[in-house]
Amino acid sequence: KRGIVAKGAQLEKVKDGFSFTEGPAVNRQGDIFFTDQPNDKIYRWNPNSNQVTLFKEGAGRSNGLYFQLDGKLIAAADLNNELWEIDPQTGKETVLVPSFRGKKLNGPNDIWIRPKGGLYFTDPLYPRPYWEGIRSKEMQQDGQHVYYLSADRTELFRVAEDLKQPNGIVGTPDGKYLYVADIGDKKTWKYEIQEDGYLTNKTLFCEMGSDGMTIDERGNVYLTGKGVTVFD
């Protein structure tokens, strides 16, 4: 039976000196993009050359990242509680989601894009010191929810409103199921994804919350917290 980690594999440090890294996302070329949120930067790591270079400064205090099918980078820009689309060639951003129902979001955190292009993101509240003079540190929405942005980017609606503090989010490669970690309730939930983007058949996946999440080609779900925990 094959293990999760290749035999003889060792954990290696790519680079240090960051304040708080977040949101690893890989493009089609295999480059890994990640954020240093307190320093308001996005970096790119090329595994072939093992070089880490600055991709974008003034990154909206981005947290979670995810690449669209067209190669553009989606970022949960926490500074002004927005969702950004960033051109990978120029680094120029476009605001996709500035608000919801006339109010700021709490702070978009993590992102997953389904195969058909629709986008899910979590919106928990983590009061930030850099919000001083920009917005209140209080809740902006009426709770901490999960949202869906349609593939044509014209419709935005909530798909989960009964969670305490949703954070990590990831779906299966076939686009049938979505996992959402409620880190505030120390649980991870599994949903069925409907054609219109709504979620049904909520079931408890495990008694553990998570920050970032990912899934491999065999369907194993990886949760992060005190280390990395893998569930089959």
Stretch-by-stretch model annotation:
Residues K1-D232:
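Sequence-structural signature of mature extracellular/luminal beta-sheet repeat domains
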